[in-house]
Amino acid sequence: MSEIVEPRTLSGFMELLPKDQVIFEKIKSEMEKVYRRYGFYPLDTPVLEDSRILLAKAGGETEKQIYRFNKGDSDLTMRFDLTVPLAKYVAKNYSELTFPFRRYQIGKVYRGERAQKGRFREFYQADIDIVGDGSLSIVNDAEIPSIIYNLFNNLGIDNFVIRINNRKVLNGLFDNFGVKESAVDILRIIDKIDKIGRDNVAKELVELKVPEATASQLLDVLTFDGSNEDKVEKLKGFAGCNEVFDAGFSELTTVIDYIAGFGVPADYYKIDLSIARGLDYYTGTVYETFIKNHPEYGSVCSGGRYDNLAEYYTKKSLPGVGISIGLTRLFYVLCENNFLNRELECP
């Protein structure tokens, strides 16, 4: 008799019992319904791509987390998000699409990071993106979080906040403080502030050769606490320091004003100058969404503006903005804390 192999699932991979899978599918269906209501079209892209396609703009932490392998003469990578495949898709099918192109995609992605609470190696993302041809109105940067607000309310989630920043504001501040040359590394360090805290971020900045006094002054700005109005006033003190900052500040305040205009209550969004987003392709507005009183789950929904992502696949200018819900993570948050809309639960 052959040896019995233990039936087990790899760490970081989700496998549900039927009653839980039913709930998961209902949540996914509700997301699709809301996305379609706002005029987004469904899209599905391959899980496997040529590594040159997916890694054209990767770098940094992303390259450390990818699943990459060779099959014959092919160098293949499993998709680590749904945004890079979208950029390739739009560039490839440009002549067949109508712009602004609004798409949603719900599918599995793969990252070889350490499995822990709220973090998986195989997980579902539920994305919406708006891609323009040549230009894309800043109004779209505000529409995205307003859609998330309405979707989360439909799911029965009430205790969340969308934290908003702008990469140009950050880059302008780095220039003002004389650390522009280290901007990419500083962004990655700041992106860890919720995980490792201000003191450890300051320590890593100093290790990066940022003067201790400069690191402290920079973090004083990025961690400044107060209302959205207070933070706008704080940032006004840097107006005119450089063109990049001024452009980002204008975009940030415009987005905040439009979010209010879309009817999102002030309790559900806030300016957070420490939000950086770890992926390298964001160029302007950035978002992260957190469940209040549950920091252990991290961001359940994040994204932002990317003006240059498609440049690796086409010479056309195809700016975009989008947001991605970590559906697998959100599912566990909803079920473990009884946040789920009763209509979505199993009978």
Which residues does each predicted region cover?
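Auxiliary tRNA-acceptor-end handling modules of aminoacyl-tRNA synthetases
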Residues: 1-20, 70
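Short secondary-structure transition/capping segments
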Residues: 7, 54-58, 173
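Positively charged, Gly/Ser-enriched RNA/tRNA-binding surfaces
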Residues: 20-38, 49-50, 71-73, 83-96, ...
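Polyanion/phosphate-binding surface patch
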Residues: 43, 47-76
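Short low-complexity, flexible loop/linker segments enriched in glycine and/or proline
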Residues: 57-61, 176-178, 285
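Acidic, His- and aromatic-enriched active-site or binding-groove loops in soluble protein domains
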Residues: 62-73, 178-206, 291-293
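Glycine-rich, mobile lid/loop segments that gate access to catalytic sites or pores
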Residues: 162-173, 178
